[in-house]
């Protein structure tokens, strides 16, 4: 596949003009003739580059407010013409070969993201000529290079310099794949946008349209292949979204350690998303996608120390997430105390990285600071289908809570209740979390019976010698019977926070009153499966 093709003529037509002037200058300096359209042509001419307008080349003017510019046989014949096979017909019709096409498309995604975007604005930002040229050039990659990403400009010039103005077939093939990926993603955005409008377009309520198109098209970019998946007999890869707007495991930079495994990534995501729920310095330790210790404190060192005390056994081989910079003192405490798979934080000091580097198996990730949580979609694959829902970004404030018991919670109980309510959201259902003084003291996760989750949380607290008396308990969903309250009271829980909504709420509240427990309803459930 070493077949080279010289680049003598290039057509440039871009919406995103970042780097295009420099790229065009580099091409022109290497003897490449430049064709261009509209705003791109004007920009290049203003910079003193010798550029021919496509309309001058075709003898046919741009028309219909720019809707028709490049849809012409002299353009597409020059792109699609097979060298050595179609030369005669091209010469007969005055069609010059075009060796490179540089195109990126109208900013459809950016346009429809604007609040108040009209249907007319969306329609006018559907590119027609651009994708047509992109697909034509990609189809004929044997003879033509198609460039859709400005990040490829420098590499292309370097390869031309190394090959006497030519590009290798391997490069043209790779560029063609990128082009097809580019147009596929572009068409998917358009289909998703208009697909979600179908009910409203036919006169139904605006709410009926929602955010779920009738056909869901997804585009993810492969970040890395994995050694294996959740188990060693499964193959796997990690795909990420383009232009992720929130600090995440997908955008994190690995600054130390061996390659992340499938389970590392899944657990790191669980830990990071949980720690992002807290504004105070916080530490979350996760094992098998469940928090096994969470704490907030004045420093991340103390937060880590207290989170670890929740369940040291489960913390072994876990994932640790912080919402503040990893410092040397905290790094030393972790390395000295336990085996850890991954540490993730917004950043890490040089001293901290020197300490963690002493353990080659420790992976350290930095994800940057996050300003806010970004709405999006969650997916769950089922056999033959895909469940899609909004991300669970719901969280109640203190003023939204309802005290339903006779006894009001104390200020400390209220703080502990809100703390463990945040944690419970990230624990697999049925989820029960005991907390006291801003640290978890027992977590019961993933049980089929809510009362058993409550019992397990109590057992874990007892195993670690943690004082449950006067603690708060959070439940991710309502208590269907009073037995969960009785179990909590038996170990000393004094405040319960839960969604409420059971047909037996009265019995559950009565149980709380019998035990002198303060009970708070959130009116919001946080199932996690």
UniProtKB/Swiss-Prot annotation:
Q: Name one GO cellular component term.
A: cytosol
State its Enzyme Commission number(s). 2.1.2.3, 3.5.4.10
Q: Does Flavoprotein count among this protein's keywords?
A: no
Give the matching InterPro entries: AICAR_Tfase_dup_dom_sf (IPR024051), Cytidine_deaminase-like (IPR016193), MGS-like_dom (IPR011607), MGS-like_dom_sf (IPR036914), PurH-like (IPR002695)
Keyword Acetylation in annotation: no
- What are the record keywords, sorted? Hydrolase, Multifunctional enzyme, Purine biosynthesis, Transferase
Q: Which residues form the MGS-like domain?
A: 1-148
Reaction catalysed by this enzyme: (6R)-10-formyltetrahydrofolate + 5-amino-1-(5-phospho-beta-D-ribosyl)imidazole-4-carboxamide = 5-formamido-1-(5-phospho-D-ribosyl)imidazole-4-carboxamide + (6S)-5,6,7,8-tetrahydrofolate; IMP + H2O = 5-formamido-1-(5-phospho-D-ribosyl)imidazole-4-carboxamide
One GO-annotated biological process of the protein:
'de novo' IMP biosynthetic process
Output the Pfam families linked to this UniProt entry: AICARFT_IMPCHas, MGS
Top-level division of the source organism's lineage: Bacteria
- Which PROSITE patterns does this one have? MGS
Q: What's one GO MF term for it?
A: phosphoribosylaminoimidazolecarboxamide formyltransferase activity
The record's listing under PANTHER family reads: BIFUNCTIONAL PURINE BIOSYNTHESIS PROTEIN ATIC (PTHR11692:SF0), BIFUNCTIONAL PURINE BIOSYNTHESIS PROTEIN PURH (PTHR11692)
Name of the protein: Bifunctional purine biosynthesis protein PurH
Gene that encodes it:
purH
């Amino acid at each position: 596949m070493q077949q080279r093709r010289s680049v003598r003529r290039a057509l440039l037509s871009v919406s995103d003009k970042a780097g295009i002037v420099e790229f065009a200058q580099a091409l022109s300096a290497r003897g490449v003739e430049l064709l261009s359209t509209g705003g791109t042509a004007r920009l290049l001419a203003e910079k003193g580059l010798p550029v021919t307008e496509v309309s001058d080349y075709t003898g046919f003017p741009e028309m219909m407010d720019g809707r028709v510019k490049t849809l012409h046989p002299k353009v597409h014949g020059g792109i699609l013409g097979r060298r050595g096979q179609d030369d005669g017909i091209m010469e007969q019709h005055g069609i010059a070969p075009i060796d490179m096409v540089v195109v990126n498309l109208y900013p459809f995604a950016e346009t429809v993201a604007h609040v108040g975007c009209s249907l007319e604005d969306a329609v006018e930002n559907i590119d027609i000529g651009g994708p047509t040229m992109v697909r034509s050039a990609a189809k004929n990659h044997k003879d033509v290079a198609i460039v859709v990403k400005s990040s490829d400009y420098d590499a292309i010039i370097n390869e031309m310099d190394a090959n006497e103005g030519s590009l290798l077939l391997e490069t043209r093939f790779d560029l063609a794949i990128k082009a097809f990926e580019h147009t596929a993603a572009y068409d998917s955005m358009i289909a998703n946008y208009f697909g979600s409008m179908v009910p409203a377009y036919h006169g139904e309520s605006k709410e009926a349209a929602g955010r779920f198109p009738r056909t869901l098209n997804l585009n993810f970019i492969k970040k890395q292949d994995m050694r294996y998946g959740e188990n060693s007999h499964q193959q796997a890869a990690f795909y990420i979204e383009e232009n992720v707007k929130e600090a995440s495991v997908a955008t994190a930079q690995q600054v130390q350690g061996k390659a992340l495994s499938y389970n590392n990534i899944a657990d790191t995501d669980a830990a990071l998303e949980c720690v992002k729920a807290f504004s105070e310095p916080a530490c979350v330790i996760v094992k098998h996608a469940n928090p096994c210790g969470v704490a907030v404190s004045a420093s991340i060192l103390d937060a880590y120390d207290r989170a670890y005390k929740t369940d040291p056994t489960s913390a072994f081989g876990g994932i640790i997430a912080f919402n503040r910079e990893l410092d040397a003192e905290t790094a030393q405490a972790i390395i000295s105390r336990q085996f850890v798979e991954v540490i993730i934080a917004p950043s890490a000091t040089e001293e901290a990285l020197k300490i963690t580097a002493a353990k080659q198996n420790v992976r350290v990730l930095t994800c940057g600071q996050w300003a806010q949580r970004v709405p999006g979609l969650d997916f769950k694959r089922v056999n033959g289908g895909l469940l899609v829902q909004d991300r669970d970004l719901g969280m109640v404030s203190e003023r939204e809570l309802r005290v339903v018991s006779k006894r009001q919670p104390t200020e400390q109980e209220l703080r502990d209740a809100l703390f463990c309510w945040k944690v419970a959201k990230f624990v697999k259902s049925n989820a029960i979390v005991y907390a006291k003084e801003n640290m978890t003291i027992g977590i019961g996760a993933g049980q089929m019976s809510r009362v058993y989750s409550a019992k397990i949380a109590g057992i874990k607290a007892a195993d670690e010698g943690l004082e449950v008396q006067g603690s708060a308990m959070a439940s991710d969903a309502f208590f269907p019977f009073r037995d969960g309250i009785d179990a909590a009271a038996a170990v000393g829980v004094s405040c319960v926070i839960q969604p409420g909504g059971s047909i037996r709420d009265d019995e559950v509240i009565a149980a709380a009153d019998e035990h002198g427990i303060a009970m708070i309803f959130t009116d919001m459930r946080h199932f996690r499966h």
